[in-house]
C-alpha cells in the first residue's frame, strides 16, 4: 500500500465523496485490535487503547490523509463500531419507523454532529410543539427547553453556538477501518449516499444565504417529522437532498415514502474507507453476517481550522467539549463561523485535493 492517493483515487474521492483503501492497515495491527476487543471486559471502553488508535496512527492511513487533507491531531480515542447479528425488529428507529420497515437493512442515513434523543417506542400525542418539547425534555439533562445546553443521548448539543445558528458539529474526514469480513451485503456495513457530499455543500451554502442558520431548524430542514408512524422522527438529512436521490428503483416504507438507496461499502479486514464529513451515511443491520460487524471509526479535523484545540478522534462536535462543555477561544476566533465556512466550502480543508478541485470548477457535470 502506498502512502498517498493516486490521481485516479483523488478523482474518485472528489466524485463520490469517499474512497476505499485496500489493505491500508497491516494484518498485525488488525490482529492486535481484534485481540484487544476479544479481551475487553464487559462494559470496558477500549477506544483510547493503543491497539485501537494505532489503526490510524501506525498505519498508512496517516500519511495518506496528510497528503490528501493535511495535518491533524493523531487520534487518542475512537468509536468501537460493533454490531451484533440481528433480525429485523419491531422497535421504532430514530426516523420514527419500525426497524423491520426501514429499507436497505435498516439504514438511517444521517449527517454527523446532530443531536439524537432515543426514539419514543410509543406513538406520540399532542401538537407538534408539544411533541418537540416532550422529546427533547427526555434527554440526559432534562427539560431545558430549546437551548444550546440541551444534550442528546449521543452527547451532542442541540446547537453548537450560543446564538443557536449552528445545529451541526463538523470535522473534515471520516476513517472507517474494517476488522472483519464485510464482502457481502447485509453484514452491518457502513452505507454511504454516494455523491451526496456535493448536494450537502450546496444546501449549506443556500441555508447560509437565507439567514446564516446551518443544519436542522435552519431553512428547509425541520428537526422532527411528525408524519411518521411514531409521530416523532429525526430528520437527519434535508428532505430535498433525500428526495433528489430517489428514483423509480428506490424502496419504500409501508406508508409509500421512497428512501434514497445508499451504497453498502464492502470491505475485508485491513481495508479502510476515507470519506468527507459532508457525505450522508449510516450503519446497517447485520442480518447476513457470520459474526459481529467490527468497524473502528475515527473523525479527523484538519489542524488549520483550530490550531490551538486538540481533536480527540471520536468527537463529531469538536467546537464543544466531548460532553458539551464550552471551550475557550482567543479573541477574534469565532469557532462557529470557521465551521460554517468549512461546511460551505468542503474542499478548503483538503490541501492535497486542490488541483483536482480546480480542474473541476465550472464543470457542473463533475
Regions found by a protein language model. Give the residues of each.
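Non-heme Fe(II) oxygenase catalytic core, chiefly the N-lobe of the double-stranded beta-helix
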Residues: 5-8, 13-16, 25-269, 285-291, ...
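Double-stranded beta-helix
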Residues: 214, 301-341
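Short, charged beta-turn/beta-strand-edge "cap" motif at the junction between a beta-strand
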Residues: 278-282
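Catalytic cores of PAPS-dependent sulfotransferases
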Residues: 268-271, 276-277
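Intrinsic low-complexity, glycine/proline- and repeat-rich
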Residues: 329-366
Amino acid at each position: 500500500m502506498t502512502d498517498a492517493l493516486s490521481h485516479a483515487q483523488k478523482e474518485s474521492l472528489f466524485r463520490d465523496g469517499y474512497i476505499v483503501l485496500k489493505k491500508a492497515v497491516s494484518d498485525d495491527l488488525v490482529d492486535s485490535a481484534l485481540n484487544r476487543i476479544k479481551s475487553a471486559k464487559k462494559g470496558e471502553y477500549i477506544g483510547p487503547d493503543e491497539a485501537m488508535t494505532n489503526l490510524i496512527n501506525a498505519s498508512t492511513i496517516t500519511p495518506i490523509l496528510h497528503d490528501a487533507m493535511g495535518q491533524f491531531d493523531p487520534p487518542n480515542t475512537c468509536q468501537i463500531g460493533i454490531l451484533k447479528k440481528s433480525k429485523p425488529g419491531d422497535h421504532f428507529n430514530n426516523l420514527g419507523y419500525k426497524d423491520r420497515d426501514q429499507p436497505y437493512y435498516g439504514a438511517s442515513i444521517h449527517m454527523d454532529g446532530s443531536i439524537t434523543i432515543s426514539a419514543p417506542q410509543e406513538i406520540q400525542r399532542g401538537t407538534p410543539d408539544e411533541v418537540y418539547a416532550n422529546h427533547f425534555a427526555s434527554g440526559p439533562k432534562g427539560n431545558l427547553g430549546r437551548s444550546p445546553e440541551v444534550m442528546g443521548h449521543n452527547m451532542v448539543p442541540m446547537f453548537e453556538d450560543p446564538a443557536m445558528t449552528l445545529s451541526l458539529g463538523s470535522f473534515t474526514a471520516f476513517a472507517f477501518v474494517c476488522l472483519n469480513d464485510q464482502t457481502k451485503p447485509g453484514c452491518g456495513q457502513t452505507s454511504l449516499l454516494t455523491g451526496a457530499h456535493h448536494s450537502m455543500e450546496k444546501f449549506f451554502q443556500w441555508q447560509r444565504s437565507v439567514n446564516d442558520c446551518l443544519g436542522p431548524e435552519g431553512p428547509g430542514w425541520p428537526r422532527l417529522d411528525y408524519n411518521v408512524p411514531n409521530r416523532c422522527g429525526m430528520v437527519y438529512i434535508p428532505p430535498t437532498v433525500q428526495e433528489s436521490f430517489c428514483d423509480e428503483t428506490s424502496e419504500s416504507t409501508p406508508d409509500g415514502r421512497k428512501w434514497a438507496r445508499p451504497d453498502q461499502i464492502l470491505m475485508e479486514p485491513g481495508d479502510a474507507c476515507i470519506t468527507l464529513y459532508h457525505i450522508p451515511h449510516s450503519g446497517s443491520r447485520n442480518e447476513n453476517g457470520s459474526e459481529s460487524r467490527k468497524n473502528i471509526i475515527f473523525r479527523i479535523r484538519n489542524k488549520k481550522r483550530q490550531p490551538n484545540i486538540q481533536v480527540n478522534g471520536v468527537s463529531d462536535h469538536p467546537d464543544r467539549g466531548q460532553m458539551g462543555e464550552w471551550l475557550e477561544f482567543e479573541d477574534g476566533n469565532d469557532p462557529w463561523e470557521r465551521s460554517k465556512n468549512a461546511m460551505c466550502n468542503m474542499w478548503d480543508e483538503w490541501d492535497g485535493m486542490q488541483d483536482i478541485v480546480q480542474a473541476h470548477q465550472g464543470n457542473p457535470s463533475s
